[in-house]
Amino acid sequence: MDTNYIIETKNLTKQYGSQKSVADLNIHVKRGRIYGLLGRNGAGKTTTMKMLLGLTKPTSGEVKIWGKSLQGNEKKLLPRIGSLIESPGFYPNLTGTENLRIFATLRGVPNNHAIKDALDLVGLPYKDKKLFSQYSLGMKQRLAIALAVMHDPELLILDEPINGLDPIGIAEVRSFIRELCDTRGKTISVSYTHLTLPT
């Protein structure tokens, strides 16, 4: 496998009983680009992303991140990755900022500037008294993305980040995904059910 790739898989396969969710998948992701993983519901997009993050063990095949096997190197590699796979477990009776502060403490994110920057990026207010339980679906999705980028990861893996967003929200998410790549040099892998990649 080539170490020039941030993500590389070789014959990646996940099988549940007799059903193959992912079969012999070979991915090559270069630095500083946006990659779209497109497919209908049930096509294996989420399973693939979970294997890239070590959340699901492959039946066979290999995952390399920054040229190193993910297996056995999770503690070194995963802190450099931000992800959104399913909804994070936010506390309903806390504000968005308070929720991010808890995650920041757990992850060792050093200061409140990281929280404010992440909220600014996704268009949520830093000083807001609205509780998470009062958030719309779109606001919840934005907070989840803010959590994914808060620790300034080099690589982002986002599973259908536009779920629940209205057309304006979709355009805004596409815009800041593009900004993360173009101005901050992030490498981003995004899954979509429909072709709505950043332009």
Positions of the model-derived regions?
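ABC transporter nucleotide-binding domains
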Residues: N4-I7, K14-V190, L195
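Single conserved hydrophobic/aromatic residue that forms the stacking wall/gate
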Residues: L197-T199
